[in-house]
């Protein structure tokens, strides 16, 4: 019991299973509603555009509303109340995810779901929740173990997503209330979020590991001489993270729409399996980090390998027309989840522990702000190329990934040069 009280894995696991249930449920309800309300005489293109437009608005609200609350919660967390940036967003998840249950049970219009990201965002949303988790993990581990520890949290997140996605398609069809599917799935999501909230608020205890005083003093004296170098590295890491997140978020957002209509036209079960395939990447990325660490590869090299893996997979997705080729493209992205945890780990090694919350939240909010442009741009590009090459948007994603590799390469060269000077 004492071991569990100091671990965040139960919260991360249950919350991600609940999120997988919600995502699959929302995907299928949106598809069903627009199938009933949209004329599909033009080969399903009107339905496709309507679904893409819904998700564009939904994702923009998710990104915008959380900006100020997340920053305020990060400041509170850095003042010593480390659980607040995790607990408050879980309250928002619990309330906002319950809306899907009401939409299904009472046959409300699907536009009611726009209130979900608003309620969730006012409680900080993922922009507060995930940086809060990473800050707690970083504070409780040494620098040597931090990259692997953060990757373990990512692995837990991925395993939960894998299992949740596998089950979600079946749960969606398990019970129909007056011919309306998804009631069991929505209920399960709400119950799991309630369990997460109870664990985080009442059971979990913050365990902060303070570095030795002499180590802190040595780090401070080192920074006096290389302050400008550290600032440059932080800026480059932020730039690379933002570009890579734009590529991944934009590509995956459209991919969620792409699989629902022709040429794939997936069912609820296939959507669940597809999401599960995406979650397997967390496992392969974790194995990759373990393997590359044993081979003594640098952090920047591991990031570049992960980015190249995503680049090849998402480019191949441009030409996907069957379920089999979809899974081949997914297989190529087996290391795509390596970059973000390693970037966060590198950032944590550049700053003081008292700034973790603000730094990680600042990074997450940078993703949100960049996403304000990413979501409509990718959606408009997708809609405008539907008649010619529907997968062109994935080529755009691969180009942005290539750009993200440039600042990481610069950081790698600077770090190698600095280590060479230290040896001399």
Question: Model segments located where?
Answer:
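C-terminal ends and interior cores of transmembrane alpha-helices
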Residues: 91-108, 308-321
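A membrane-interface helix-boundary motif in multi-pass transporters
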Residues: 173-191, 380-401
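Cytoplasmic helix-loop-helix junction between adjacent transmembrane helices
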Residues: 116-156
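Hydrophobic core of transmembrane alpha-helices in multi-pass small-molecule transporters
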Residues: 13, 96, 107-128, 242, ...
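Multi-pass alpha-helical transporter architecture, strongest
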Residues: 14, 192-205, 373, 395-424
């Amino acid at each position: 019991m004492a071991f569990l009280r100091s671990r965040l894995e139960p919260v991360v696991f249950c919350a991600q299973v609940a999120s997988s249930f919600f995502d699959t449920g929302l995907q299928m309800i949106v598809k069903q509603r627009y199938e009933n309300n949209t004329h599909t005489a033009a080969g399903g293109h009107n339905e496709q555009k309507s679904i893409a437009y819904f998700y564009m608005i939904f994702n923009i609200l998710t990104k915008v509303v959380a900006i100020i609350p997340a920053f305020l919660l990060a400041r509170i967390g850095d003042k010593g109340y480390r659980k607040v940036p995790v607990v408050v967003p879980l309250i928002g998840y619990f309330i906002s995810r319950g809306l899907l249950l009401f939409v299904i049970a009472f046959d409300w219009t699907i536009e009611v779901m726009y209130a979900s990201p608003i309620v969730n965002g006012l409680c900080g949303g993922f922009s507060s929740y995930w940086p809060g988790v990473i800050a707690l993990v970083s504070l409780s581990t040494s620098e040597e173990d931090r990259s692997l520890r953060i990757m373990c949290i990512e692995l837990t997140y991925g395993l939960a997503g894998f299992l949740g996605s596998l089950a979600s398609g079946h749960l969606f069809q398990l019970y129909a209330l007056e011919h309306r599917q998804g009631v069991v799935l929505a209920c399960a999501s709400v119950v799991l979020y309630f369990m997460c909230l109870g664990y985080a608020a009442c059971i979990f205890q913050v365990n902060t590991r303070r570095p030795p005083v002499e180590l802190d003093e040595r780090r401070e004296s080192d920074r006096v001489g290389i302050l400008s170098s550290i600032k440059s590295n932080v800026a480059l890491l932020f730039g690379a993270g933002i570009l890579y997140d734009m590529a991944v978020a934009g590509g995956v957002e459209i991919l969620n729409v792409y699989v629902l209509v022709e040429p794939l036209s997936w069912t609820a079960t296939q959507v669940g399996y597809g999401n599960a395939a995406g979650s397997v990447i967390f496992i392969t990325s974790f194995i990759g980090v373990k393997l590359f660490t044993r081979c003594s590869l640098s952090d920047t090299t591991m990031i570049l390998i992960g980015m190249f893996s995503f680049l090849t997979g998402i480019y191949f997705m441009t030409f996907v027309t069957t379920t089999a080729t979809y899974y081949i493209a997914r297989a190529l992205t087996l290391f795509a989840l390596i970059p973000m945890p390693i970037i966060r780990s590198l950032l944590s090694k550049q700053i003081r522990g008292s700034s973790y919350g603000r730094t990680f939240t600042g990074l997450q909010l940078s993703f949100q702000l960049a996403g304000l442009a990413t979501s409509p741009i990718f959606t408009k590009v997708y809609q405008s190329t539907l008649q010619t090459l529907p997968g062109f948007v994935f080529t755009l994603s691969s180009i942005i990934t290539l750009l993200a590799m440039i600042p990481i390469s610069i950081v790698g060269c600077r770090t190698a040069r600095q280590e060479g000077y230290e040896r001399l």
